[in-house]
Amino acid sequence: MVNTKVTLCGIEMDNPIIPASGTFGYGYEFAELYDINMLGTFSFKGTTREPRFGNPTPRIAEYAGGLLNAVGLQNPGVDAVIETELPKLKQVFHKPVMANVSGFSVAEYAEVCEKLDAQEQVGWLEVNISCPNVHGGGAAFGADPKSAAEVTKAVRAVTKKPIILKLSPTAADIAAVARACEDAGADGMSLINTLPGMRIDLKRRRPLLANTTGGMSGPGMFPLAVRMVYQVYEAVSIPIVGMGGVTTAEDVIELMLAGAAAVGVGAANLVEPYACKTIIEDLPAVMERYGMENLTEIIGGAHHG
């Protein structure tokens, strides 16, 4: 009998599967399709201080290796999430949930996290530092170690809940950013976020996305995710949620061998709503095939020494 249980920042999960933020709504939408309590947990839509209407359409474009998306952090704002979305979720999901937080200033991150800290069902705060720093020239907070550490410190000051920093693959040195976040009080990392990309409509001779560029996701990103998880695992001692192009139970095992303690599934949910259910159901047989009894024991297994 295999054991799929893992622990993420002190919270035990039945399995390592976490639908990624922005691909699973607030959970209750998917609860109409299957029992979402089979998930390890999930990360709900990126939450900001004020409501955001997102980018104009079209927001999604396909490419051979996956999807481009430019949704633009559409969400009703943190107060509405607390008053409306979390009560709906509580009726169908009976586990701690991961709250994904976005901000455009250090103060906004702290304010949103402080409000979510008071919510009993929120188990982890996933802090998306791929957002542009509007007071710092527009570069993403996660682009350099100093600004990433500033956000981490500000959030650490307002919560005792586990903080997971979501890292951008555009950072010049993702391992240095990860170390800075750990030193500033982060409890975990999630990576990788999307990579900026673009498609052009040949008939219109214009960008396919109204926003011109969008975030690349899907299977084409998987080797990059494996490499960066492997790299960050060697740089920090806190757990990693690995993500980027995961579509199968084999992908989950591969990312865990690279160093992930849990695994996010993103674009696959948009292509196939039952993707996470299938991966969870397939996981025990894949573990048995490769002689694995306990998932916790394989974390980082691809590293030397």
Model-derived regions: residue spans:
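A short, charged, Gly/Pro-tolerant segment at domain boundaries
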Residues: 296-305
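Short acidic/polar active-site loop segments enriched in Thr and Asp
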Residues: 39-40, 45, 95, 122-125, ...
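Alpha/beta enzyme core
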Residues: 83, 104-241, 247-260, 265
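Short gly/pro/ser/thr-enriched loop/turn and capping motifs at secondary-structure boundaries
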Residues: 48-53, 132-134, 196-199, 270-272
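Active-site metal-binding loops of divalent metal-dependent hydrolases
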Residues: 22-23, 244-246
